[in-house]
Amino acid sequence: MILYSYFRSSAAYRVRIALNIKDINYSIKPIHLLRSGGEQHHPEFHKINPQNLVPVLTHNNQNISQSLAIMEYLETYQPTPSLFPENTNNKTASQEFSLMICCDIHPLNNLRVLNYLKHGKASEIDVTQWVQHWINEGFSALETKISSTKSNDEGRYCFGDTATIADCCLIPQIYNALRYDVDMSKYPTLNKVYQHCLAQPDFHQAAPEQQTDYPD
């Protein structure tokens, strides 16, 4: 397996965590999203993903884009350990939780959106406030949902004592939130999960600072 990745891409970060949880061997092919006008726009990568986005997982003569689709593929390729809770209600909740991040929070502070704002003459302060607004709005809903499932302090991860797709999606989004000085004290349950996950090898090894393309 080859993962086209950028060290700071939240979506690529999700997939790296999932690959590590499943203990699947893979190699990284870095795609720098800023260098040389963005390597994702170069013709050779455009052939791999016409959307010009990372991540892309190449395996069995397939180029699979979209982090959630990649994780679904990994689940089919190697069912255990699963990225989903055994409990049906928690499985549905983890999918809902992941989609809230991947569809409603992350796209609004993706690099190409922020670049569009900057090209529209938005200041750095404007861009930061934009990111903070949408992350805070999303995290407020996530905190409400997850805290209701942890009324008895059940489980160290989002849904129980095993990492799931929800944790794969949450940790990169919190990492991104901290880059923009979002106050995580407002989200104690999310932050508790984040702190626990940071200490786990599968998450630690997937972190931006551990990637070969992380700048010295």
Which residues does each PLM region occupy?
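Conserved beta-strand edge residues that scaffold enzyme active sites
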Residues: 32-35, 191, 211
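Short Asp/Glu-rich motifs
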Residues: 37-39, 196, 216
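Alpha-helix N-cap and coil->helix boundary residues
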Residues: 65, 89, 185-189, 205
